[in-house]
Amino acid sequence: MDERRLIRVSKYLSKHLRHQPERLGLTLEPGGWVGVEQLLAACAANNVAISLAELHEVVEQNNKQRFGFDPTGQKIRAHQGHSVTVDLGLVAQQPPIILYHGTAKHNLAIILRDGLRPMQRQHVHLSRDRATALQVGARHGQAVILIVQADELFQAGQAFFCSDNGVWLTTAIDPAYLALER
């Protein structure tokens, strides 16, 4: 599959596995899972033909590893980023001392005043490395990187989760735990 098709299919899956499963007539199971055959049939019924081989390619080749199959290969889900309520079954764990959050420069003043909020998602997304944060922030304009004092937040009682693709998740972050990387 060429790169453009890979991106289009990935975006289509993101939309329907993270935000609007009902638009395809899908109901996410606990953990955010949906049957592979059910997903492919729903896509086809909505005039979007995706083959099983293409689905596997998107899961394997997506640079952010947004999706994963269950151990049987019969179900698929988005690893994180849901705006619909989904319990991914992640276990709270101690985060690294610091994590990073990339954002566009035009968001900076509000974030430094109000902190990081999940917005339309269930969680704030954090990266273990600054390169990933920079890539995320650059999607919406000139990127800036915020350093998150994750261990301090954890010690203060805030829960952190690490998704299957290595993205750290938490609830809102007070600005006192944020610093602009210079």
UniProtKB/Swiss-Prot annotation:
This protein's record includes keyword NAD: yes
EC number of the protein: 2.7.1.-
Keywords recorded for this protein, A-Z: NAD, Transferase
Biological-process GO terms, alphabetical: tRNA splicing, via endonucleolytic cleavage and ligation
Recorded GO MF terms: NAD+ poly-ADP-ribosyltransferase activity; tRNA 2'-phosphotransferase activity
Pfam families, A to Z: PTS_2-RNA
HAMAP family given in the database record: KptA (MF_00299)
Family: Belongs to the KptA/TPT1 family.
Stored PANTHER family: PUTATIVE PHOSPHOTRANSFERASE (PTHR12684), TRNA 2'-PHOSPHOTRANSFERASE 1 (PTHR12684:SF2)
Function: Removes the 2'-phosphate from RNA via an intermediate in which the phosphate is ADP-ribosylated by NAD followed by a presumed transesterification to release the RNA and generate ADP-ribose 1''-2''-cyclic phosphate (APPR>P). May function as an ADP-ribosylase.
Protein name in the entry: Probable RNA 2'-phosphotransferase
